A protein has these predicted regions:
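Structural signature of PLP-dependent enzymes
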Residues: 13, 319-344, 376-383
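PLP-dependent enzyme catalytic core of the Aspartate aminotransferase-like
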Residues: 324-326, 392-434
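Active-site-adjacent loop/helix segments that line or gate small-molecule/cofactor pockets in enzymes
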Residues: 3-52
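Active-site PLP attachment segment
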Residues: 254-290, 308-313
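Conserved PLP-binding catalytic core of the aspartate aminotransferase-like
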Residues: 336-340, 350-388
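Glycine-rich loop-to-alpha-helix module at the N-terminal edge of alpha/beta enzyme cores
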Residues: 65-142
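Conserved PLP phosphate-binding loop immediately N-terminal to the Schiff-base lysine helix
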Residues: 203-216, 230-252, 258
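PLP-dependent aspartate aminotransferase-fold enzymes
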Residues: 108-202, 206, 217, 337-340
């Protein structure tokens, strides 16, 4: 049986096992285009609907249990029931839901982030997308320039989408694209557009682009070339700040001018932030007596009703202050590297063109023989085989992204990870024997 024929069979089996999810999907499509409001959740024949979650386990509306190896695309690092976060959020919300003013927790979280990640200043947003938009605005105002350099395969939010080139629905910035993990090619693009470049924005590892880590030399040469022409370096660490004590960029031996954050720091609540050098972030200083306005200088306005919302800010304080400390982050990165090696060991036992890429606790399966180093390698994979692996893992109680992404969480037990490896082994064996 060909992979394409096997996919049709697997989809029918999936539909037969999940009638309640199908019913929910059909009803939801009456009111929401596509049946949901998050495009990445789409897969054939229809996405699962979940009823509950506890620890690292999800339960769908048909009653099936899954080991959650997706972790909400890195936002669910803590699992589904971290009481050290939830108890503090509940207590804060009992006191006040929306103060309409400043509150002590936001200064606490700002201090925790600056000390943890080695940044001078930070401001909060509602998402990583907003954080990246504000980081770009910061760079444009600081330089007086308008052009942005991004990378083919990069993703910085729903309106900063470059996974398959610049999406036509993107925010209307003047963007030039450079090849990821190609230092010489990037240097040429920067040299060509240098006089008009406000910023270079880059992920230390392509997230939506397939968990493809950057080469350290590529990052260093890109940053040096950007600074040589006066452009601001923006590192999108919305996903990768989870790695090591200060984020993946630090482990690569580089430092950006502005860094964006999000995902797990909100403890499951919406969160984003952008921070970095004081001279850049102080463009937002509205202090009446000592700020930029008092000196007759331009001040950037940064509004947002929920930028400092009580739930997200309180959760962030608990996440960085108690749960995901620097020591825990360092150990978790090591555990992720070890688990990815185990995954590679399982793959090596089967005669299928499948590999794994990633860094620390983030990784992705690819239906191709050679590990991709850029988005072209990711795009070259066998889509039918990719889907068979995804559906096969679901059938065996393991929830991943349809595109192959897997993220290790704090709630995963060694027993659960062993069961994941067994499920992957059994899935690949079944595919190879079709």
């Amino acid at each position: 049986m060909s992979f394409s024929d096997a996919v049709l069979v697997a989809r029918r089996d999936f539909a037969d096992r999940n009638p309640a999810s199908k019913l929910h999907y059909d009803e939801a499509r009456r009111f929401m285009p596509g049946g949901h409001t998050r495009t990445v959740l789409t897969h054939a024949p229809f996405p699962l609907a979940f009823a509950s979650g506890q620890g690292a386990t999800l339960v769908d509306v048909d009653g099936h249990e899954y080991i959650d190896l997706l972790g909400d695309y890195t936002a669910g690092l803590l699992g589904h029931s971290e009481t050290r976060v939830l108890d503090k959020v509940k207590a804060a919300l009992d006191n006040n839901v929306s103060v309409g003013g400043i509150h002590p927790a936001e200064a606490t979280l700002a201090r925790l982030m600056c000390e943890r990640f080695g940044i001078d200043r930070v401001r909060f947003t509602n998402s990583g997308t907003e954080a990246n938009l504000m980081a770009i605005a910061t760079a444009m105002m600081a330089t007086g320039r308008s052009k942005i350099l991004a990378f083919i395969g990069g993703y910085h939010g729903g309106v900063l989408y470059f996974v398959s080139g610049a999406a036509p629905w993107n925010s209307p910035y003047d963007v030039v694209l450079a090849p990821y993990n190609d230092a010489a090619g990037t240097e040429r693009v920067i040299a060509e557009h240098g006089a008009s470049l406000a910023a270079v924005i880059v992920e230390p590892m392509l997230g939506s682009g397939g968990c493809v880590p950057a080469d350290g030399e590529f990052i260093r040469r890109t940053f040096a070339a950007a600074r040589a022409v006066g452009a601001v370096v923006i590192a999108d660490q919305v996903m990768t700040s989870r790695h090591g004590r200060r984020g993946m960029l630090d482990l690569l031996g580089s430092e950006a001018d502005i860094v964006t954050y999000g995902k797990y720091i909100g403890g499951g609540f919406s969160f984003g932030a952008f921070g970095g050098r004081a001279d850049l972030l102080d463009q937002f200083d509205t202090s009446v007596e000592t700020g930029r306005a008092a000196k007759g200088e331009m001040v950037i306005s940064h509004a947002g009703t929920f930028n400092n919302n009580m739930a997200s800010i309180t959760a962030g304080c608990a996440v960085l202050g108690e749960v995901f400390t620097a020591d825990v982050a360092e150990a978790h990165t090591t555990r992720g590297d070890e688990f990815r090696s185990m995954v590679a060991g399982v793959l090596a036992r089967h005669p299928l063109p499948v590999c794994v890429t990633g860094f620390g606790s983030m990784m992705s399966l690819h239906a191709c023989a050679t590990a991709p180093t850029d988005i072209r390698g990711v795009a070259a994979r066998d889509n039918d085989l990719q889907e068979l692996i995804f559906l096969g893992l679901l059938q065996r109680g393991v929830y991943t992204a349809a595109r192959g992404m897997m993220n290790l969480g704090l709630a995963h037990t060694d027993d659960q990870l062993g069961r994941v490896l067994d499920a992957l082994d059994d899935t690949l064996r079944a595919i190879a024997h079709k």
